Regions:
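Acyl-thioester-dependent acyl-group transfer interface
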Residues: 19, 23, 32-38, 44-46, ...
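Alpha-helical scaffolds flanking conserved acidic
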Residues: 54-55, 80
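Flexible, P/S/T/G-rich "lid" or insertion loops adjacent to the active sites of thioester-utilizing
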Residues: 1-52
Length: 260
């Protein structure tokens, strides 16, 4: 981050509280896992038909599923905001193995009851397009690094920083309803690749973010993995049903906690 830091941030970023997905909670030490195995070429084909990228399509289906499965098409004063990590390496020609990413939010505001999927997808895709530009990502990075360079903050005792960071984390967590991260296409070296059919990742829970997802593609299989702190699976059902309606073959498995 310091290497590519260019200028102090001109302004801070304002956030608003996002919709919280609530329900019957699992015990603290449990959370539900649901894998959806998809044929990657089919996902690419469908995304192209809608005129969006694979990531935009999956996030659009995620937003649609929350709108139909959780909100039941009812308008809400708070937006659905989905945290989306963005890999910064392609923007700076970096091959670092350290964490090098910025975070944006895919937004959908439910202001009426009759949105079509195409309208939800358009909102989500446009919110991502407006944020995932090198200029905007540089602003985010500059803001974060400028705080690190602030002499007054650097002189602050560690115990005060720890308290402040906890408060800031809780506030930032409230700005998102959940998170969807796409690790992209993963390749394994020979001869190991011959023994692996698919790969997946799971995200742990955060305060006020009770539903998250991780996406991993390997060969011709894309695995979309939900992790959830709530027992209800209405959102997941709508999600995989929509993919199936769009002509994508879906195979689903869980970690079994939904049946206990």
């Amino acid at each position: 981050y310091l290497k590519h830091y260019k200028r102090p941030a001109k302004k801070s970023y304002k956030t608003e509280k996002a919709l919280v997905i609530r329900g019957e909670m699992f015990p603290r030490e449990y959370f539900g896992i649901m894998h959806g195995y998809l044929h990657l070429p089919d996902v690419k084909r469908v995304a192209k038909q809608y005129g969006v990228t694979v990531n935009q399509y999956l996030l659009g289906v995620f937003a649609w599923s929350v709108y139909k499965g959780y909100m039941h098409s009812i308008p809400h004063r708070r937006p659905l905001a989905v945290c989306v990590p963005v890999n910064l390496r392609p923007y700076y020609g970096s091959n670092t193995t350290k964490n090098f990413f910025a975070v944006v939010s895919a937004m959908f505001r439910a202001e009426r009851e009759d949105y079509t999927f195409e309208e939800v997808l358009a909102q989500v895709a446009e919110s991502l397009k407006s944020q995932i530009t090198k200029e905007h990502l540089e602003e985010i990075m500059a803001y974060n690094v400028s705080n690190e360079k602030n002499k007054a903050l650097r002189a602050t005792p560690l115990f005060i920083k720890n308290i402040a960071m906890k408060i800031i984390y809780q506030m930032s967590a409230k700005a998102n309803s959940g998170c969807v991260t796409n690790l992209g296409l993963v390749k394994l070296a020979s001869p190991y690749d011959a023994y692996v059919e698919s790969l997946y990742a799971t995200l742990s829970m955060s305060k006020n973010q009770n539903l998250k997802a991780a996406v991993v593609s390997y060969k011709d299989t894309l695995v979309f993995t939900f992790s959830s702190a709530v027992r209800e699976v209405d959102v997941q059902k709508v999600f995989f049903r929509k993919l199936s309606e769009d002509g994508i073959d879906v195979s689903v498995e869980t970690n079994g906690v939904y049946y206990e």
